[in-house]
């Protein structure tokens, strides 16, 4: 679950990390009043969406008058911002952040993620702030400096100083950076975050460090113990189908193809998408119904898949381990009857009671194609889309 920049900065302030004075506003009048609270300009106004690339898309602007602030708010509030990180429809803008402008001398990067290989929280710092860290990692990886947090001792000030020295910081900047590092690490651990970025972390012309931007991603599996973060969730920034799937504990990710995929197991789901592409098709989604593929969950999965107008056929790929394939077949038949599926449905069942399940599908009289193998299923669903 992602947070907006203004929400990230609110948390930064509570953990002792410096950020520009700013206010999130929902109306042009609020935006003008925010500028008055901040004081003399210039100011920076920013669209609040869960996507990068806002500046290049016109969603971030330096302004010198309250009239310009009002004009920016009127231009964007209630509209959608399209960036290179959004789809063609963009993300809705419901708030803009009005901040005091900062005199920037240099831009740095500071971020943290969970490194699955080392099973540690790893902090990354670089002198190449203000650009995508992925690009830096690809082109000049030697410019990214890392430290890993020991899960027993937690973050240590010496680790912050180590990164500060590698960034070329001196004097008071070392102490300031160490304070930011410790605050960010504590925030990461206490709030069950999955990712945090300050990009850029700037050095002002007065020689001070300021968190100019902030991006936080919370671990969705830990939200049950983070009530404050749950309240910060902005569902308008999420794909409606993905949000609906989450309510049923279905793992759904929308893609750009026209073959809907319903699979039990994340690995099998990825393999299913691969074999669809191998035979010339394009998956419309990733959907993992998990181990408990009940009739109710299968029905909801069909509803979610078919809510995408691009879907011309559905590929159901189920491996019956503990779950019996004949019961899965009953669920598929019931779901197709309830939802009223009007596109071809190709089903491949393998494992526990697979033959009985395939017979039930064949005897149902519905527009369900029972495949004999994974390859056969992929070929049939691609052919079905081509026939349409």
From Swiss-Prot:
UniProt cofactor note: Binds 1 Mg(2+) ion per subunit.
Enzyme Commission number(s) from the entry: 6.2.1.5
Positions that bind Mg(2+): 199, 213
Cofactor(s), by name: Mg(2+)
GO molecular-function terms, A-Z: ATP binding; magnesium ion binding; succinate-CoA ligase (ADP-forming) activity; succinate-CoA ligase (GDP-forming) activity
Catalysis performed (reactions): succinate + ATP + CoA = succinyl-CoA + ADP + phosphate; GTP + succinate + CoA = succinyl-CoA + GDP + phosphate
GO biological process: succinyl-CoA metabolic process; tricarboxylic acid cycle
Residue ranges of every copy of the ATP-grasp domain listed in the record: 9-244
Biological pathway: Carbohydrate metabolism; tricarboxylic acid cycle; succinate from succinyl-CoA (ligase route): step 1/1
A cellular component term, taken from the record's GO annotations: cytosol
Coiled coil location: none
Metal-binding listed as a keyword: yes
Residues reported in the UniProt entry to bind ATP: 46, 53-55, 99, 102, 107
Function of the molecule: Succinyl-CoA synthetase functions in the citric acid cycle (TCA), coupling the hydrolysis of succinyl-CoA to the synthesis of either ATP or GTP and thus represents the only step of substrate-level phosphorylation in the TCA. The beta subunit provides nucleotide specificity of the enzyme and binds the substrate succinate, while the binding sites for coenzyme A and phosphate are found in the alpha subunit.
Family membership: Belongs to the succinate/malate CoA ligase beta subunit family.
Protein name: Succinate--CoA ligase [ADP-forming] subunit beta
Gene name of this polypeptide: sucC
């Amino acid at each position: 679950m992602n947070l907006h920049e203004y929400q990230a900065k609110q948390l930064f302030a509570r953990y002792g990390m410096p950020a520009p004075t700013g206010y999130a506003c929902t109306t042009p009048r609020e935006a003008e009043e925010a500028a008055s609270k901040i004081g003399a300009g210039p100011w920076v106004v920013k669209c609040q969406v869960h996507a990068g690339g806002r500046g290049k898309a016109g969603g971030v602007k330096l302004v010198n008058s309250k009239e310009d602030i009002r004009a920016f708010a009127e231009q964007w509030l209630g509209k959608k911002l399209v960036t290179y990180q959004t789809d063609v429809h963009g993300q809705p803008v419901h708030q803009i952040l009005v901040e005091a402008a900062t005199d920037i001398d240099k831009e740095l990067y500071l971020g943290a993620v969970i490194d699955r290989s080392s099973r540690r929280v790893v902090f990354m710092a670089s002198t190449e702030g203000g650009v995508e860290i992925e690009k830096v990692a690809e082109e000049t990886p030697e410019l990214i400096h890392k430290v890993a947090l020991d899960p027993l001792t937690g973050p240590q000030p010496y680790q912050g100083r180590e990164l500060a020295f590698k960034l070329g910081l001196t004097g008071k900047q070392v102490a300031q950076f160490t304070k930011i590092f410790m605050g960010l690490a504590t925030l990461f651990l206490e709030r069950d975050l999955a990712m945090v970025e300050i990009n850029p972390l700037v050095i002002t012309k007065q020689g001070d460090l300021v968190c100019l931007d902030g991006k936080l991603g919370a671990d969705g599996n830990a939200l049950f113990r983070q009530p404050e973060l749950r309240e910060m969730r902005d569902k308008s920034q999420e794909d409606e189908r993905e949000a609906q799937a989450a309510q049923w504990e279905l793992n759904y990710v929308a893609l750009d193809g026209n073959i809907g995929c319903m699979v039990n197991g994340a690995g099998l789901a990825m393999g299913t998408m691969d074999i669809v592409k191998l035979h010339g098709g394009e998956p419309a989604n990733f959907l993992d119904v998990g181990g408990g593929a009940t009739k109710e969950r299968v029905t909801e999965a069909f509803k979610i898949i078919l809510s995408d107008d691009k879907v011309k056929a559905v590929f159901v790929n189920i491996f019956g381990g503990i779950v019996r394939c004949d019961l899965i077949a009953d669920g598929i038949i019931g779901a197709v009857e309830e939802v009223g599926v009007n596109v071809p449905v190709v089903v491949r069942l393998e494992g526990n009671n697979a033959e009985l399940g395939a017979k039930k599908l064949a005897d149902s009289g519905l527009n369900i194609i029972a495949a004999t193998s994974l390859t056969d299923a992929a070929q049939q669903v691609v052919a079905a889309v081509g026939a349409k």
